[in-house]
Amino acid sequence: MDHPLPAGRLSPPWKLFADHLRLTVRLTPNGGRDAFDGIDTDSEGETYLGARVTAVPEKGKANKALIALVSKSVGVAKSSVSVISGETARKKILRIEGDPEDLARKLEVFLE
């Protein structure tokens, strides 16, 4: 259920499932501001959405800030966003509960 993209554009860093979307994020904690840096690829060619938060990576503070940033950006409750992989790593996979097509549309702004 991934969205096809025109030639030359990066593939989206998310996958759609029946009741949620999984988003790959590379987080920069202590990043000076809470914001997204756009989509990029890692050394293995996997795409991710870059994000930075002002919170430090202690006791889950940066993860909580990331969840708040993502939930606000796609218009869901914080409780609808969870880290399912990479709890202590910079690269994380987030599960966002909701209509996956609607969530993907809201994230497509980062593909432009």
From Swiss-Prot:
It comes from the Bacteria. SMART domains: DUF167. Disulfide bonds: none annotated. HAMAP family: UPF0235. NCBIfam families: DUF167 family protein, PRK01310.1. Belongs to the UPF0235 family. This is UPF0235 protein RHE_CH03912. It comes from Rhizobium etli (strain ATCC 51251 / DSM 11541 / JCM 21823 / NBRC 15573 / CFN 42).
